[in-house]
A protein has these predicted regions:
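Beta-rich carbohydrate-recognition and catalytic domains
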Residues: 1-43, 48-98, 105-163, 173
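Cationic, low-complexity basic patches in intrinsically disordered or flexible, solvent-exposed regions
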Residues: 166
């Protein structure tokens, strides 16, 4: 899934597939697969979410100027259903870019597995200390529908995760 920019200035999410390991790509004839009619809807990250009873695709994207992260679900990568959104929160200078959401296992003080927290990354541009890009992160819970930040530490300030004149859009695989 990628962001397609239309001639009228609007952005939508489209699909392309590769049958040769990523050397060439074939665009889906029915593109776009998700169109909000927005000029700032971009930067999708898609991952497979496995809940207790169901597994499906989750798309994390931004409404950049609104400083919101949007969550969608799909069973087939073609039809998307809105789940929820997060933001604005934390650093809100500039626009939000390149969101990422991933699980992070943690261990207890004794060294045994204790659970999983979810980390939401959002890049800002501008928004960094030096006026350039930066990345902030939020730790919380994701239940397959909604991201809820931890109350004790709702947001780590921009630049705490990443900063620099040309650094933006880190993605965790």
């Amino acid at each position: 899934v990628y962001t397609s920019a239309r001639r009228d200035g609007l952005q939508a999410q489209s699909l392309a597939v590769s049958f040769d390991g990523g050397y060439t790509w074939e665009k889906y004839a029915g593109n776009p697969v998700l169109d909000r009619g927005s000029a700032d809807f971009r930067d999708p990250k898609v991952f497979r979410y496995a809940g207790a009873d169901d597994a499906y695709w989750v798309m994390v994207a931004v409404e950049a100027a609104e400083r919101r992260v949007l969550f969608y679900r799909s069973d087939d990568l073609l039809s998307w259903t809105y789940l929820s959104d997060y933001g604005p929160a934390g650093a809100v200078g500039g626009v939000w870019e390149c969101p990422d959401l991933f699980p992070l296992p943690y261990v207890s003080g004794a060294g045994s597995a204790a659970g999983v927290r979810w980390v939401l990354l959002v890049s800002l541009y501008p928004g960094g200390v030096a006026g350039g890009p930066a990345t902030q992160y939020v730790v919380g819970e994701f239940d397959g529908i909604r991201f809820v930040p931890d109350v004790a530490h709702p947001c780590v300030a921009a630049d705490a995760a990443e900063a620099g004149e040309h650094r933006i859009g880190g993605i965790v695989e």
